[in-house]
């Protein structure tokens, strides 16, 4: 019998499974909705879909480069234990290879792309969820490019808890590029240089520092000078080039870069779970939630 789009839509809403999985299940069960749900459950696909309301705030970052292209990605899981699972690591590598080869514009586009095995990225992740038993999400990625006279710097901290990918122009010294990536991982600057800081943000900080100085009872005639000094400290906290180099605090990052006749084109820093609010549950609630399932 012919399967209608409405049937597929209804099954997707009931199970959260992918469109092609739903269509296939309905075809195999002659359009019987209940049997199709059972079939999806038997295959572990509906089970995976039911995990969609959970918060995936663990996981790992990964960086891969190929010639003049590089990718950094973050994939989330629910527990740190799964993030160390070989199956999860294989998934990370497979996704990295796909993103590097196909350079989708964003996660939404990536999820709909076909992979070498014929499935979409979304279907591939769903099948991995069924095997691993936790919600897994491709949270974000960035593909960077460089030219032959530039260098990628890749650094993973704590096995991928933090990942940084940098591009240095004017040098092919990957060791220096990696050192800068390590610095970014440790210090977490927000900008490359102070000229990237908006006038609005600078003025806002200046206003706060001025009020701080006045509250301290400093004479007005020296407040302006104090504020500019403190503003320099502010820039050192947020701007990469102004920071003391983590491997040698006697040097500024800009001095390390200048010694190689290089400039920082860009950097991307991912920290697993940043910005995701992890649900806090007590043990009694956790037990009750398991009982209800």
UniProtKB/Swiss-Prot annotation:
GO biological process: translational elongation
Molecular function via GO: translation elongation factor activity
Keywords: Cytoplasm, Elongation factor, Phosphoprotein, Protein biosynthesis
Pfam families: EF_TS
Involved in Mg(2+) ion dislocation from EF-Tu, as annotated region: 79-82
Primary role: Associates with the EF-Tu.GDP complex and induces the exchange of GDP to GTP. It remains bound to the aminoacyl-tRNA.EF-Tu.GTP complex up to the GTP hydrolysis stage on the ribosome.
Protein name, per record: Elongation factor Ts
Organism encoding this protein: Bacillus subtilis (strain 168)
């Amino acid at each position: 019998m012919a399967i209608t789009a409405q049937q597929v839509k209804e099954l997707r809403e009931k199970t959260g499974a992918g469109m092609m999985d739903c269509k296939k299940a309905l075809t195999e069960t002659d359009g019987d909705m209940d049997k199709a749900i059972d079939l999806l459950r038997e295959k572990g696909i509906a089970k995976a879909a039911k995990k969609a309301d959970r918060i995936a705030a663990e996981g790992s970052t990964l960086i891969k480069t190929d010639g003049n292209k590089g990718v950094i990605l973050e994939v989330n899981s629910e527990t740190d234990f799964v993030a160390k699972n070989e199956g999860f690591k294989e998934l990370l590598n497979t996704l990295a290879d796909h993103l590097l080869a196909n350079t989708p514009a964003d996660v939404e586009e990536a999820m709909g792309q076909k992979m070498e095995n014929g499935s979409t990225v979304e279907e591939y992740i769903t099948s991995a969820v069924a095997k691993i038993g936790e919600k897994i999400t491709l949270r974000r990625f960035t593909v960077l490019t460089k030219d032959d006279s530039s260098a990628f710097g890749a650094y993973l901290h704590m096995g991928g808890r933090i990942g940084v990918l940098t591009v240095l122009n004017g040098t092919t010294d990957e060791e220096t590029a990696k050192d800068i990536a390590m610095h970014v991982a440790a210090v977490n600057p927000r900008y490359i240089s102070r000229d990237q800081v908006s006038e609005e943000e600078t003025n806002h900080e200046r206003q706060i520092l001025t009020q701080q100085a006045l509250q301290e009872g400093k004479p007005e005639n020296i407040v302006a000078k104090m504020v500019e000094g403190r503003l320099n400290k502010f820039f050192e906290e947020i701007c990469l080039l102004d920071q003391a180099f983590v491997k040698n605090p006697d040097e500024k990052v800009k001095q390390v870069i200048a010694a190689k006749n290089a400039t920082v084109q860009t950097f991307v820093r991912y920290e697993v779970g940043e910005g995701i609010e992890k649900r806090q549950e007590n043990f009694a609630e956790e037990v009750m939630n398991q009982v209800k399932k």
